[in-house]
C-alpha cells in the first residue's frame, strides 16, 4: 500500500488551472509518484503524494522530489511548503 503525505504549498501569482495541471504533471514526471486529492484555492495548493508500492516513504523523500520539481518547473514562487503525514 502506498503511504500518502499531505503537501501544502502557499504561493502567489499562479493561475488555478495551471496549478492543477502542474500538480498532475508531477505524477507523470515521476512515474512512481502517486498524486491525489488536488485542491487549488486562493493562494494555496494542496494534494496528497506518495510513491507506488512503498510503505517506507518519509516526508523527506516527498520533499526532495517536490523541491526538485519546483526547480525544474517554475510556475510560481512558493512562500511556504509543508509535507506532513
Question: Which functions belong to the PLM regions below?
Answer:
Residues 2, 43, 64, 78-79:
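Generic cytosolic/nucleocytoplasmic N-terminal low-complexity/intrinsically disordered segments
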Residues 2-13, 45-47:
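Short glycine-/aliphatic-rich beta-strand segments at the starts of folded cytosolic domains
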Residues 10-34, 66:
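Short amphipathic alpha-helix segments
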Residues 31-67:
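Short, intrinsically disordered low-complexity segments
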Residues 32-40, 68-85:
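Conserved short beta-strand edge segments in small beta-sheet-based binding/regulatory domains
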Amino acid at each position: 500500500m502506498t503511504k500518502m503525505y499531505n503537501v501544502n504549498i502557499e504561493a502567489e501569482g499562479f493561475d488555478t488551472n495551471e496549478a492543477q495541471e502542474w500538480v498532475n504533471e508531477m505524477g507523470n514526471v515521476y512515474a512512481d509518484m502517486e498524486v491525489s486529492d488536488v485542491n487549488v484555492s486562493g493562494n494555496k495548493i494542496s494534494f496528497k503524494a506518495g510513491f507506488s508500492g512503498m510503505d517506507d516513504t518519509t516526508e523527506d523523500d516527498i520533499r526532495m522530489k517536490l523541491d526538485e520539481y519546483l526547480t525544474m518547473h517554475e510556475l510560481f514562487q512558493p512562500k511556504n511548503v509543508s509535507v506532513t503525514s
